[in-house]
From Swiss-Prot:
GO terms, biological process: protein folding; RNA polymerase I assembly; RNA polymerase II core complex assembly; RNA polymerase III assembly
Xref: Pfam families: Prefoldin (PF02996)
Species of the source: Drosophila melanogaster
GO-annotated cellular components: cytoplasm; prefoldin complex
Protein name: Probable prefoldin subunit 5
Residues annotated as transmembrane: none
Protein task: Binds specifically to cytosolic chaperonin (c-CPN) and transfers target proteins to it. Binds to nascent polypeptide chain and promotes folding in an environment in which there are many competing pathways for nonnative proteins.
UniProt family annotation: Belongs to the prefoldin subunit alpha family.
Quaternary data: Heterohexamer of two PFD-alpha type and four PFD-beta type subunits.
Keywords from the named record: Chaperone
One Gene Ontology MF term: unfolded protein binding
Superkingdom as given in the UniProt entry: Eukaryota
CDD domains: Prefoldin_5 (cd23157)
Length: 168
């Protein structure tokens, strides 16, 4: 028995063995799509986490003697312009959807630390969902394979029995 996919908040249980192979195939396909979506979400979150961790790490490399140091400033992911470090204690941070905030060095490090932790919490929540969906998917597959094997065995038995003919 497993919970229904459409009502995760309810504790309603269904007996997978009572479903037809066609119903099981439909549920299997739905869960394949849901698992793919969850995996895509996890991939996106891991990318965000790496971006935040990289930003925090970059802040850790700043040295007090870097004032007025020449650097390359990224305009895009593959295009840079020369620049100079003007103030080592003032950073502009992209917080998303076109908004930026200005923070000092410690505030910037703290911001990225908190973002990494928050994203990690979200990853853990989604990994639990992924595990639940995978377990249910595996249950559906087991029952489906059992039903398909039983159907194949029945068909094989029917084909091996000689046809009964009536003689007049």
């Amino acid at each position: 028995m497993a919970a229904t996919p459409s009502a995760p908040a309810k504790s309603e249980m269904i007996d997978l063995t009572k479903l037809s192979p066609e119903q099981l195939i439909q549920i299997k396909q739905e869960f394949e799509q849901e698992i793919t979506n969850v995996q895509d979400s996890l991939s996106t979150l891991h990318g965000c986490q790496a971006k935040y961790a990289g930003s925090k790490e970059a802040l850790g490399t700043f040295q007090p003697n870097w004032e007025n140091r020449q650097i390359l400033v990224p305009l895009t992911s593959s295009m840079y312009v020369p620049g100079r470090v003007k103030d080592l204690n003032r950073f502009v941070i992209d917080i998303g959807t076109g908004y930026y905030i200005e923070k000092d060095l410690e505030g910037s490090k703290d911001y990225f630390k908190r973002r990494v932790e928050y994203v990690q919490e979200q990853i853990e929540k989604i990994e639990k969902i992924h595990l639940q969906k995978t377990r249910f998917y595996n249950s559906v597959m087991s029952v489906l394979e059992m039903k398909q094997a039983a159907a194949a065995k029945l068909q094989s038995q029917q084909q091996s029995q000689p046809a009964v003919t009536q003689s007049s």
